[in-house]
Amino acid sequence: MSKAMGETLGRLEAVIHDRLAAGEAEASYVASLAAKGRGKIAQKLGEEAVEAVIAAVSEDDPALIGEASDLVFHLSILLAERGLTWDAIAAELDRRHGTSGHTEKAARA
């Protein structure tokens, strides 16, 4: 991943935190979605995940890029609503690095 991607996620996270803190549902999609509750945020995340899968299976790369962007955006909202950060996700991925996927999954079971 490029440094630019980390900077992009950092900017996105900051904007989402600002919009959540402002709580202006009439002026902000992020705030309006959050006002509907965690369940609605999770539902929207699921919808975006399905759309990303459909784009991938149909081999439509531009659509997949768009849907993956929507997926990351909505995941960012859900993480922020829960008080979690991309740094926490990065730390977990770093912790798992070098561990076999089968081994890591078995450790969680």
Curated annotation (Swiss-Prot):
Transmembrane segments: none annotated. Gene3D superfamilies: MazG-like. It catalyses: 1-(5-phospho-beta-D-ribosyl)-ATP + H2O = 1-(5-phospho-beta-D-ribosyl)-5'-AMP + diphosphate + H(+). GO terms for biological process: L-histidine biosynthetic process. It comes from the Bacteria. Pathway: Amino-acid biosynthesis; L-histidine biosynthesis; L-histidine from 5-phospho-alpha-D-ribose 1-diphosphate: step 2/9. The keyword Cytoplasm applies. One of its GO terms (cellular component) is cytoplasm. Keywords: Amino-acid biosynthesis, ATP-binding, Cytoplasm, Histidine biosynthesis, Hydrolase, Nucleotide-binding. Its EC number is 3.6.1.31. HAMAP family: HisE. Belongs to the PRA-PH family. This is Phosphoribosyl-ATP pyrophosphatase. It comes from Sphingopyxis alaskensis (strain DSM 13593 / LMG 18877 / RB2256) (Sphingomonas alaskensis). The gene is hisE.
